[in-house]
Every structure is written in structure tokens, then in C-alpha cells.
Amino acid sequence: MRGSRIALVALAALGLAAAAPAGGTGAPDPPSVVLVTRDCASLDVVCPAYARAARRTGTRARIVSPDPREDITATFALLARQGHDLVIGDPALAPQLADAAAQNPQARFAVIDMPLALGSPRPPNVAIIEVRPRDAAYLAGWLAGRMERLRRGPDAVGAVGGYPIPPVDEFIVPFRAGALRATHGARVITGYSRSFTDPTACKVLAERQVAQGAGVLLDAAGGCGPGTLDVARRAGIWAVGVDRDRSGLGPHILTSVVKRYDRAFALLMRQARNDKLPAGRGMVVGLRQGGVELGRISPRVPGRVLRELAAVRRDVVAGRIKVPGAPPG
């Protein structure tokens, strides 16, 4: 793994050094798990969640961030030969992980937060876990539409995505469906900035949606998204964030579609400990499994709306409401 930099600074900052219990107690050795990711700075939700899961499950955990110039497949293969109970990769590294898995059939691998449809076919020693936001995104859309009904004027909500790809549309498609259900036919304005990194691209698109009457904006564009959220703040309208709880940004945040990566990682770590990893198969963790949820809801939302939202949530969890997802990409 020459050239790989094990993210020691990140390990210390995330508290991973204390994740594993001390040996010599007679207890079984804790499982050893390693996460291979491009950069914890760009995955600043995933890496802290990994650390929390390691502490919660008593797992010996490492993070490896390979140099982009090196052979990533070789990095995965070397980690597999080192005897880790589980080697996890982020979706961007899935092709290299699959190659290494085919070369090391005795090792166990997993890809975190990858749509199952994109991970087939897969080697028999690779598990895919999809943190599926669609049910929580539907609830966020319903809440957006319901609050829009309280605003004077025509009902309209907007959604700014990065690219028209399944991981983005898993937010936008159910958000749209929820808004339509709450408003019985609001105008839903969607668009794609064609960027995950340029806030200006999202700002331009969000301003266009506000000019078309949108009273709520969904941000589903990664690092481009702050442009959308700032437009909502300046326009005095609601915004809905994704991935993490964005309520700390200000009173314009209606709610957020929060991915609980810590619970997904904890599930994988426990399965590795108990030798029950669903290798060769995929798992979905969504609203019902606690893998996603709505973040803090604005205190300005009326109590009657919260009660209605709770009823919709029960219907979604029970399967009485069929929530659409992204079309196959």
C-alpha cells in the first residue's frame, strides 16, 4: 500500500483510537474493520458516523485514504490480506473494491451507501448496504407542500439537484410525490445544477425557481447546495437540507432528510462480529430500519401540521403509502 496515507489525523480527531477495548480480559477479540475512502474532508458526514459506530460496537476501526495516483485495487487487496474482518469502501471506489474482492475470495468486503441497482452483478463476498432516503424525503416533501398551503398565493415548491442520477433522484422523486400529496397538485419545479461543488451554480438555479414562485427549496446537490440554502434564506422562504441536520444554519430551515450512516456502519460491524454479513447480497436501511429520519423540524410548524405529518409517517412505515424512488439509471 505504498503511497497510501492512513488518516491518522482523522483517526485522532474522530476518536477512533479509543474504539476498541483493551485486550487481555479473556473476551473475544473485537472485529477489525477498515474504511477506504477518498477523503474524509469531502465525506464529513460519513467519517464521523463511522467513528461513532466503532465506539458503539467496540470495533477496532481504521480509515485509509489512498493517494489518487496509486493502484486502489492493490490497496483493497493488501488490506484484505492483512486479515481484517471487513473492508468497506465508499461508492466511488466500488469498481476497485469489486476487483480486489474477486482476487481475494476469502476476504469480506462491503460498499456503503450505494443504490442496489448500481451494484449488480457483484462478487459473492461483497455486501452492499444502501442508506435509502426516499421515505424520509417523501415526508419532507409532504411537510414542504403542507406548509406551502399556509402561504398566500399559488402553491409551488422547488428542488435543486446536482445531477439527474439515482442517488440524487432518490431525494427529488419522493420529495415531489410528498409535496403533491399534501397540496393536491402544487407546482413542483425541479432542476439540476450539473455540479456537486459550485455553490454559484445552485444559487442561479435556486433564484430561478424562487422567481417562478417556489416557497420551499430542497437542496440535493452536495457541496453545491449551500448556494440553494442561502437563496432561501435571503428570499425569506423555507429550505430543506439533506444528509445531515441543517437546522443550525438558521430559522429558514424547515427540516432535513438525515442519513444515519452511524446506524448503517454499526449494522455492518455487528454482522462482521457475528459472521452474518450478507455477502453477495444487498441490504436497505431506510425509515423503517432507522437508517434515515427527518432532522429537527422548525418550531414555526403548527402543531396540527405535526400531527398530520406523524399520521403520514405511520402510513409510510406501514406500507399504506407507496413511496416512489428514482428510476433506474
Predicted features by range, described:
Residues 19-21:
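N-terminal Sec signal peptide cleavage junction
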Residues 7-17:
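Bacterial N-terminal signal peptides
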Residues 23-329:
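A residue-level marker of the well-folded mature domains of exported/periplasmic proteins
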Residues 1-5:
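Positively charged n-region of N-terminal signal peptides that target proteins for export
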